[in-house]
């Protein structure tokens, strides 16, 4: 049987459980452990039924095991990951961080994954970042983008207490990613918790300022190419319509604009399909883990 990277999931909540189902389908990753702190959590119960070794005794239990993971996916909280990250590093365990801790470099698969395959710890930014930064990157690789603004609208019921408590952190982290990874000179991020019932799937609007003489066909083609790339790991990611180009106006600060509308429908592995905002995080994290495993196993001669 082909070799797979041994994986531990730290956290046993909604995101961790959805991630588990994606990892179970992977040709490169083998989930072996799920670590939580709540012995009654549904995530631990499901993981145990699926054959994983589970514990509610936290990260220290995992690190005390004689057989250790190659990779850890952590979906706890920023402060928990900041405490655990040095322990993973000391044990030689690579970490994929789904919290806002940002201990390691931020990764958006279509934009900069190849640059960070050797990093001991990588951060998945935010759901809004995973959904919108690829579009900013698609535009900025064709023309200069002096300003980009993203608006992420997610179903209110999909936003848990952690998201609600960290709205400011969400916007700052996403805006920073729009600049550092997306390539915009300045960036802004807005999140809307949509209270509609039945819940609406995630929808995002991405505004990019562009030169008035920009090659619009090249920009549109680049956007379509990046959307196709994201769809390889998030099939429910799609354009709502063609990118819209607007001439400079007072409303746009005198700059030409390209506006892109996308929506993200989840795969429904554990979370409902409307929770595309959470699904894109687990799918992107799985993609990153698989690419790290491919690099490690192929270069190391395990395959």
From Swiss-Prot:
Active site (record annotation): 127
Domain of life per record: Bacteria
At which positions is NAD(+) bound? Answer: 12-15, 158-166, 277
Alphabetical GO biological process terms: catabolic process
**What is the reaction catalyzed?**
propanal + NAD(+) + CoA = propanoyl-CoA + NADH + H(+); acetaldehyde + NAD(+) + CoA = acetyl-CoA + NADH + H(+)
Q: List the disulfide bonds.
A: none
Its signal peptide is: none
Keywords of the record, alphabetical order, are:
Aromatic hydrocarbons catabolism, NAD, Oxidoreductase
Query: One MF term from GO for this chain?
Result: acetaldehyde dehydrogenase (acetylating) activity
The top EC class is: oxidoreductase
Protease among keywords: no
Q: What is the effect of changing residue 41 to I?
A: 6600-fold decrease in catalytic efficiency with coenzyme A
Which Pfam families does its entry note? AcetDehyd-dimer, Semialdhyde_dh
| Stored InterPro entries | Acetaldehyde_dehydrogenase, Acetylaldehyde_DH_C, NAD(P)-bd_dom_sf, Semialdehyde_DH_NAD-bd
Quote the record's activity regulation: Unlike HsaF, HsaG is active both in the presence and absence of its partner enzyme.
EC annotation from Swiss-Prot or TrEMBL: 1.2.1.87, 1.2.1.10
Q: What does this protein do?
A: Involved in cholesterol degradation. Catalyzes the conversion of propanal to propanoyl-CoA, using NAD(+) and coenzyme A. Has a broad substrate specificity, and can also use acetaldehyde, butyrlaldehyde, isobutyrlaldehyde and pentaldehyde as substrates.
Q: What quaternary structure, including any partners, is listed in this protein's UniProt entry?
A: Monomer. Forms a heterotetramer composed of two aldolase (HsaF) and two dehydrogenase (HsaG) subunits.
Q: Which NCBIfam families match?
A: ac_ald_DH_ac, PRK08300.1
Q: Which family does it belong to?
A: Belongs to the acetaldehyde dehydrogenase family.
Q: What protein name is recorded for this chain?
A: Propanal dehydrogenase (CoA-propanoylating)
Name its species: Mycobacterium tuberculosis (strain ATCC 25618 / H37Rv)
